């Protein structure tokens, strides 16, 4: 294990930016999503995979094209030097991947997440194969210029509304009236379905819903499907207690009669979750 003292800087060289752009979404890194300090979603990877990407044939092919601005990398030592420049440019930061038992030891307020590993920022960068690092660099959006131009065009279009021809003004008026009509119809349906629900709740055993998925988290068409539905009755607690009470009775009856369960009968097993590192 080699601990390398590194001083970070806000100055970022163009070479470091080009290499970061190549590595950011590279499949060789096999990046995963983790929780930095148990709060922020980040992409993390192992150093050995980054070195593998820098020494790959794909990198050599793209490095041969001078437009990409990539420097030649011959061996692992040169790959380590390039990686150090990424740390100095604050494109990546070293982290520690915490196991379940280590999360509470690091911070009592942190809660383990079943789907995302918890990562803790480290003050030392260990240039070793299984060392973990997190991206703090985001590639520039190639469509940001197009979005900016469209935004300016939209602003000027609204400002110059008095200069629009009459047919465009009439078209916008009809369009706005149509949208307001749809919005009013939506609120009318919501009020009617609420009134129907309250009436059927007081009169019928089960309440009636018009468009039961209207406010559910689904698509526009799915919100109006099905047309109607009935409110599901709540399960009584007595049924649960009777089921739980029947289990010991069956067990005791088996002990009293002396009948043993079949050997091939399915038995419940405890599920043990084990964290496996890649």
Swiss-Prot record:
The keyword Protein transport applies. Part of a complex that contains SEC61, SEC62, SEC63, SEC66 and SEC72. One of its GO terms (molecular function) is protein transmembrane transporter activity. The gene is SEC62. This is Translocation protein SEC62. Required for preprotein translocation. It comes from Debaryomyces hansenii (strain ATCC 36239 / CBS 767 / BCRC 21394 / JCM 1990 / NBRC 0083 / IGC 2968) (Yeast). Its main location: endoplasmic reticulum. Residues 230-278 are annotated as: Disordered. InterPro entries: Sec62, Sec62_asco. It is a multi-pass membrane protein. Belongs to the SEC62 family. One of its GO terms (biological process) is post-translational protein targeting to membrane, translocation. Coiled coil: none annotated.
